[in-house]
């Protein structure tokens, strides 16, 4: 074989090998898709900072001067108070009297002595509480919240003893139908006193017994536990001061053992002198908790208009002292309405 022939044979063989290996002018396969690049998450827009809400400044506590001015304004200007003028009023706490005043024509003053009628009831309740060391018996409660059934009391005579008063006319009559039901009256306390060591006492003896136990200086014009005291606003205020100061056991019993009093809304009530209010009665005192008009104060209004009270929180006491020319239970109720206006003005430090 010539050189030319060898060269051609070699080229032919190389071409065949290249074709067999997929080399000559053909494609080597599809181009792979590029790896996707992740889209970055959007940067969150920051929320604006909340606008701070300013804390309201605390309401300043009224000063004693502000409270006194407000109470004086109510005493002289509130319609309920104008209706019962003239009178003397005072408000205090455990430290003593804080404010007072007299309104109306020829009004009484702090030292004016007067009959206080049913304001005597709180005094006897306090006496029994003190004698019992603050732990009343069930029998005590039965008499002192006026559900005992002794409901025919009329009056005592000045020269009687507790026992002879209790036996006088219908005073000691027991009405079985009223037992367990509220009936406002003096027979409950007179019977209780007669049965508990006070039977032989006349006015002076009764005053001595009550005052020795309570640290007070009351006088009695008749031996009636529920209505026989005559005294001044100053003397009664001192008694109330001892209550709110925690010196008398009755303080812890204010509002204790309450009974409903309004016959229109309570089947266990026969008679209440406060028409139109659903208050309660406790140990010788009212709880002024009528849902519509009550403020929860504890009080013992008297028939001639003398009205002592202790605030619901037992921190403040007050007296409205007057002596109506015509006695009647509604005089006490009228004073109670005025007393509420004075009490509210004192608490708020403003009137109206």
Listing of model-derived features with the role each one plays in the protein:
Residues 64-72, 137-249, 257:
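Active-site-adjacent helix/loop patches that line small-molecule binding or acyl-intermediate pockets
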Residues 60-69, 294-352:
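Structured C-terminal helix/loop/strand segments within mature extracytoplasmic catalytic/sensor domains
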Residues 259-320:
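Active-site Gly/Thr loop motif
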Residues 112-135, 191-196, 315:
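Active-site SXXK
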Residues 18-20:
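C-terminal motif of bacterial Sec signal peptides marking the signal peptidase cleavage site
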Residues 22-26:
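Bacterial signal peptide processing site
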Residues 1-10:
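Bacterial N-terminal signal peptides that target proteins for export
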Residues 67-114, 286, 307-311, 315-322:
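A short, well-structured edge-of-sheet supersecondary motif
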């Amino acid at each position: 074989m010539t050189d030319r022939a060898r060269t051609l044979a070699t080229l032919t063989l190389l071409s065949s090998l290249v074709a067999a290996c997929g080399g000559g002018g053909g494609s080597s396969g599809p181009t792979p898709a590029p790896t996707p690049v992740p889209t970055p998450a959007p940067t969150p827009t920051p929320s604006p900072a909340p606008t701070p809400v300013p804390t309201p400044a605390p309401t300043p506590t009224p000063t004693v001067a502000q409270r006194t001015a407000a109470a004086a304004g109510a005493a002289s200007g509130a319609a309920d108070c104008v209706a019962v003028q003239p009178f003397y009023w005072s408000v205090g706490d455990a430290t003593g009297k804080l404010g007072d005043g007299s309104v109306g024509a020829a009004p009484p003053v702090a030292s004016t002595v007067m009959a206080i009628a049913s304001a005597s009831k709180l005094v006897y309740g306090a006496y029994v509480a003190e004698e019992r060391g603050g732990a009343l018996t069930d029998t005590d409660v039965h008499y002192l919240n006026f559900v005992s059934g002794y409901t025919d009391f009329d009056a005592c005579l000045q020269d009687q003893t507790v026992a002879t008063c209790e036996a006088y006319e219908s005073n000691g009559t027991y009405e079985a139908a009223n037992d367990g039901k509220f009936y406002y009256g003096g027979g409950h306390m007179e019977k209780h006193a007669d049965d508990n060591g006070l039977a032989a006492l006349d006015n002076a003896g009764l005053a001595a017994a009550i005052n020795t136990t309570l640290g007070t200086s009351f006088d009695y014009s008749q031996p009636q536990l529920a209505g026989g005291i005559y005294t001044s606003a100053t003397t009664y205020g001192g008694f109330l001061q001892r209550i709110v100061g925690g010196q008398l056991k009755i303080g812890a019993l204010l509002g204790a053992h309450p009974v409903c009093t309004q016959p229109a809304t309570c089947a266990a009530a026969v008679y209440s002198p406060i028409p139109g209010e659903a208050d309660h009665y406790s140990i010788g005192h009212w709880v002024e908790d009528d849902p519509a008009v009550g403020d929860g104060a504890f009080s013992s209004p008297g028939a001639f208009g003398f009205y002592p009270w202790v605030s619901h929180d037992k921190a403040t006491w007050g007296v409205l002292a007057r002596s109506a020319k015509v006695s009647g239970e509604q005089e006490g109720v009228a004073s109670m309405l005025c007393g509420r206006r004075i009490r509210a003005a004192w608490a708020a430090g403003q009137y109206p």
